């Protein structure tokens, strides 16, 4: 399939090794720089995969309305893809998420409906957004991408793992992969591609300590966008991972700031959580190993919030 416009630039992102954050006596830590995608987020991969798969099997008709619930980056990515392909897009989001993300969706032409949540990302917020998007689809006949239940989005991230295999052939081998999970699409797609070539890969899911449901804790309110949704992601099962790491919100924010100031990696809080987890794993493994994680998105999406204020 020929791809024109901005969607032709999705994927093929660079990978860099941390120079200072991990310290001495640790495994190498490598970061896939997904902010290099057109909207500054790895969600461009899943948005393109969901739309193109629906086009291919007829679920999405030319000019049909598309609807999605999103905290922002998926919405921005869908807005980009729909703009290039000529689909109107309606987004259900919330004021709990970064203003920059909402503005980006609208800049690409999406219609955005916001659900108020002054406390932040609460356990009930995502379910309420999901219900509203389902209502819109039922009322209008829109195609609902429904990211949490859409298996095509996992396929969109498989290429990320395949790219890593080509970029980091070793030695040393990639010993561990960690990723903050919302839909868990990036974790599932990338880890499956990596594990197919590296059967001993240690697979680590990352979540906020304030809503550590996968660790057996209660759902809670937090401010690390892109995950910690208050329940297990529908497509993520215990057999898919080897370990769960719960990163406190304050540490995720601190690590994101440190990465900007010491590594030149300018990102959001979810990347901070990824880096914190990767550093802990690297310290545990020691020299002779590689730990890989992902820069989720660009810090430009968070300049109006508390992260860099």
Question: Can you annotate each of these PLM segments?
Answer:
Residues 1-309:
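PLP-dependent amino-acid enzyme catalytic core
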């Amino acid at each position: 399939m020929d791809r024109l416009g901005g969607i032709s630039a999705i994927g093929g992102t660079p990978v860099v090794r941390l120079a200072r954050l991990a310290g001495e006596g640790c495994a190498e830590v490598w970061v896939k720089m997904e902010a290099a995608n057109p909207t500054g987020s790895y969600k461009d991969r899943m948005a393109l995969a969901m739309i193109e798969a629906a086009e291919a099997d007829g679920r999405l008709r030319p000019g049909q309305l598309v609807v999605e619930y999103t905290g922002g980056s998926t919405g921005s990515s869908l807005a980009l893809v729909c703009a290039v392909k000529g689909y109107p897009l309606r987004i259900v989001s919330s004021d709990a998420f970064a203003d920059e993300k909402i503005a980006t969706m609208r800049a690409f032409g999406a219609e955005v409906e916001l659900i108020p949540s002054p406390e932040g990302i609460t356990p009930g917020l995502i379910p309420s957004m999901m219900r509203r998007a389902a209502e819109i689809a039922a009322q209008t006949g829109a195609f609902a991408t429904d990211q949490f239940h859409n298996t095509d989005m996992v396929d969109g991230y498989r290429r990320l793992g395949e790219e890593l295999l080509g970029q980091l052939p070793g030695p040393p081998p990639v010993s561990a992969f960690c990723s903050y999970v919302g839909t868990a699409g990036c974790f599932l797609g990338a880890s499956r591609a990596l594990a197919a070539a590296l059967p001993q890969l240690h697979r680590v899911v990352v979540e906020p300590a304030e809503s550590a449901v996968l660790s057996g804790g209660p759902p809670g309110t937090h401010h690390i966008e892109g995950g910690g949704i208050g329940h297990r992601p529908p497509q993520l099962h215990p057999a898919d991972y080897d370990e769960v790491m719960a990163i406190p919100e304050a540490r995720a924010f601190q690590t994101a700031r440190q990465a900007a100031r010491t590594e030149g990696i300018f990102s959001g809080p979810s990347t901070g959580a990824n880096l914190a987890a990767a550093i802990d794993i690297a310290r545990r493994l020691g020299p002779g190993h590689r730990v890989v994680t992902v820069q989720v998105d660009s810090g430009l999406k968070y300049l109006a919030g508390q992260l860099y204020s």
